[in-house]
Structures are given as C-alpha cells and as structure tokens.
Amino acid sequence: MPHSPQKLYKKLLGGAGEKRVAAYLKKQGCKILKRNYRTPFGEADLIVQDKDEIAFVEVKTRTSDKFGEPREAVTPEKQRRYKKIAECFWKERGEEPNARFDVAEVYSDGTIEYFKNAF
C-alpha cells in the first residue's frame, strides 16, 4: 500500500534530519553505531559512541514550532520505550557501558539544537 503524500513527506523530512544530526555528531567526534535501530519496543533514530558513553538519540525535525518545541514531542511514554530499546541493545552487545538519552532538534533552516541527557 503506497504511503500518503503527507506520510512520505514526514518520512523524508525525518530522514534528512537524522542525516544532518549524524553529520553534526561525527564532527563532534562521535562514532555512529546504529541508525534506525529497531526493536519490538520501537526504534532509536541514532545510537552513538561519545567517548566512554553510548548515547541513544531521538531526532525531532520540524518545519515550524506551531505545535510546540520539537523536544516536547518526546513524551514520558517515548522515554520509557527508549529505555527498553537500550536494554535490547545491551543484550545484543553483551555489555552495559555508561548510557545517556539525548534529543536533537532540527529546524528547516538547518539549525540543530542538541540536548545531552535530555531524559
């Protein structure tokens, strides 16, 4: 079944935002471990190694703040799911290093706001 034009636009917009954040994090010295890491609990947009920490990154891309700040869309339920996603990742790797949960906001003008330890 084909995607509606609106869903396709959102998917393309989100993918572009994730690429932009991945490039930003690489410039900061991070190593991208996984993109769009899927589990039964949901998907982590990016998982990155930042020195001795693993960051699970939720990327929010918006063309406006009409519906609030992008980070406001990371609800308590989404935060719980991200923690379950992290558990799946640790089981897969057989280790549990220092972890944090970050949120990246990407705006249509290319601006990125990055929040370490967002939740």
Segments (PLM) and residue ranges:
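A short acidic/basic microdomain associated with nuclease active sites
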Residues: K26-P40
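Conserved catalytic cores of phosphodiester-cleaving nucleases, focusing on short active-site segments
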Residues: A44-D65, P70, Y82
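Positively charged, solvent-exposed patches that mediate nucleic-acid binding
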Residues: Y37, Q49-D50, R71, E87, ...
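Short acidic/glycine-enriched loop/turn segments that link adjacent beta-strands
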Residues: P40-G42, D109
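Residues at secondary-structure transition points
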Residues: L8, L12, A16, F41, ...
